[in-house]
């Protein structure tokens, strides 16, 4: 009988990937990035370990959504105080904090536990093309071109 191999923490090789979000659909980009953060693109994927890679997303301010979502999609947050609910549309949040839109979409696709919080720390999102991670020599991650054309 074969035994399942569990990779040791030292044997996990973490890569850095660069994703350009310009003209990409939000949900399709988020699923691909969440999969890489989780490590599902590797043969050594283990559900209970962090085997994923680091991902840098640039041009978060140029992400797309379809239909009337720019005006109708709502983002809610609460201060914790009575009456502290704040509601903002996609359009308004994209002007103010475009990184938060991408972060929130990807975070929702990660596990909602301590492992998910650890995976989320490996995501870096920037609104322009500049990022401070050139020393890591990130590889460009090609997303499915058919997904962005829809």
Curated annotation (Swiss-Prot):
List keywords of the entry alphabetically. Ribonucleoprotein, Ribosomal protein
Segments of this protein annotated with the region Disordered: 130-150
Write one Gene Ontology MF term. Answer: structural constituent of ribosome
Instruction: State the CDD domains in the record.
Output: Ribosomal_L13
Q: Which Gene3D superfamilies match?
A: Ribosomal protein L13
One GO BP:
negative regulation of translation
A GO CC annotation given for this chain:
cytosolic large ribosomal subunit
- Stored Pfam families: Ribosomal_L13
Spell out the PANTHER family in the cross-references.
Answer: LARGE RIBOSOMAL SUBUNIT PROTEIN UL13M, RIBOSOMAL PROTEIN L13
Q: Which family does it belong to?
A: Belongs to the universal ribosomal protein uL13 family.
Q: Which HAMAP family match?
A: Ribosomal_uL13
The protein's job, in short, is: This protein is one of the early assembly proteins of the 50S ribosomal subunit, although it is not seen to bind rRNA by itself. It is important during the early stages of 50S assembly.
Oligomeric form and interacting partners: Part of the 50S ribosomal subunit.
Protein name stated in the entry: Large ribosomal subunit protein uL13
Organism for this UniProt entry: Synechococcus sp. (strain CC9311)
Question: Which taxonomic lineage does the organism of this UniProt entry have?
Answer: Bacteria, Bacillati, Cyanobacteriota, Cyanophyceae, Synechococcales
């Amino acid at each position: 009988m074969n035994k399942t191999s569990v990779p040791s923490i030292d044997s996990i090789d973490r890569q850095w990937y660069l994703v350009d979000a310009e003209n990409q659909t939000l949900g399709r980009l988020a699923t691909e990035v969440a999969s890489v953060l989780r490590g599902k693109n590797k043969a050594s994927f283990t559900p209970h370990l962090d085997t994923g890679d680091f991902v840098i997303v640039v041009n978060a301010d140029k992400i797309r959504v379809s239909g009337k979502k720019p005006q109708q999609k709502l983002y809610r947050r609460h201060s914790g105080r009575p009456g502290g609910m704040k509601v903002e549309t996609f359009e308004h949040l994209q002007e103010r904090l475009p990184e938060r839109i991408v972060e929130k979409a990807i975070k929702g696709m990660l596990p909602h536990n301590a492992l998910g919080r650890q995976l989320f720390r490996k995501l870096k999102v920037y609104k322009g093309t500049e990022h401070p991670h050139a020393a890591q020599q990130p590889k460009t991650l090609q997303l499915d071109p058919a997904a962005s054309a829809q």
